[in-house]
Amino acid sequence: MIYKPGDLPERCTETMSFRPRVKRLYFRLCADSLPIFGKRVFLLCAIRHQVTRFCSTYLEMKSRRYCRKEETMKKKIVTLLMASVLTVMCATGCGNGNQNATDNKVDANTQDTQTESVSDDQKAADEVADLIDAIYVQERTDDTDAQCEAAKAAWDKLTDAQKALVEGENADPDYFGRDTGDASQDDPRNQDDIGENEILVVSFGTSFNDSRVADIKGIEDAIQEANPDWSVRRAFTAQIIINHVQARDGEKIDNMDQALDRAVANGVKNLVVQPTHLMHGAEYDELVEAVNNYSDKFESVKVAEPLLGEVGDDATVVNDDKKAVAEILTAEAVKTAGFDSLDAAKEDGTAFVFMGHGTSHTAKISYSQMQAQMNDLGYDNVFIGTVEGEPEETSCENVIEAVKNAGYKKVVLRPLMVVAGDHANNDMAGKDDDSWMSMFQASGNFGSVAAQIAGLGEIEGVQKLYVAHTAAAIGK
């Protein structure tokens, strides 16, 4: 309870009227101190007792006409009153000090508990990050299967709050947490007992399930349908992706060595390797080298052409494969954008930008050849770019400048890649400032920028090109 001067006992109030100085002192002490006493009622009782006793003493003295000692007694009363009040206030202060110390200790303990909780959460998240980083490698070992299983099991034990804290050299919450589609719709094509004839379709790979099904499986299915007397099998060249899919989805995909060893174990005699790579780049060269190491294990080994065929050394000389891809890709992009023709898109002020990967390999001339082919076909509003900016004219900045100078105010981005995986979803259409979508928008030159996230592999016309390349290899 909080006491105010008006709540004092009547006798005390009357008594304190004997001198304004004493009255002011009393009320000042009460007004300043009594709110504190509200926290401790017993202290209030003590001071009330002292005040009452002193006031009664004074009245008694006055009634007995101790006039000569009045001034002396007044001084004693005031002194005793002040001493009593100060004593109680000190006691209260000590009590409050003890209480504050207790409160501070509780707050500190609470903070320590919260800190320990955060520390435990971060520790659990860091352990998972380390496990992810351990399988984010390009080399498979005898421990890889167990490491993939351990990483997923540890992730599943985390709370949602802990999962958000996962951050490593390569690890992040998206490694296990991002939904990329239904992996059960895919087929790793690693079955045994397949007969003597095998077509091994080799891809870089992607951890995006929907894209893997639409693009890579789409090509594999088309080749299998066209070659019923052959068994189509799969291999990925990116162990990082193989580990990711295995750890997250439990789907085991062979790497090149595993696939070739499996073919040998299955007694395959005739092997045709069909790369889904775009061009004769570094990855294609590595693939050929790996196959050559197994050439003595089979009666015949043949490697088919990648999608764009032979490279050549002249940027203005284009083969039939590049021409076909230019026509097929452009037609698909125009249709997806809702136009009846490329000319209709041009009249609308819309340009199409096809983004490839880019490479420092001599095969980078293929991108220049693709742009030359677009120009030869009269596709004035089609531009070729690359993530890596190699060749130089294909960098995002240079492509933005080219589209702006051509006068187009609307842009449609689409990957010039077999698979619409990480590059298409993040480098092209991502929300980060360095994505092509963001950079085109930030340039301020275009009224609209849209993205079509679809790989070449899902286009029927492109699948037929791969089928033709496989047939050519079989017929060699």
What are these regions (language model features)?
Residues 42-44, 48-72:
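Short, Lys/Arg-enriched N-terminal segments with co-localized hydrophobic residues
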Residues 89-93:
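C-terminal motif of bacterial Sec signal peptides marking the signal peptidase cleavage site
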Residues 95-97:
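Bacterial signal peptide processing site
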Residues 174-412, 417-476:
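Extended amphipathic ligand-handling, pore-lining, and cofactor/metal-binding catalytic surfaces
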Residues 116-180:
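Beta-rich interaction/scaffold domains
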Residues 73-81:
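Bacterial N-terminal signal peptides that target proteins for export
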Residues 100-119:
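Low-complexity, Pro/Thr/Ser/Glu-rich flexible segments characteristic
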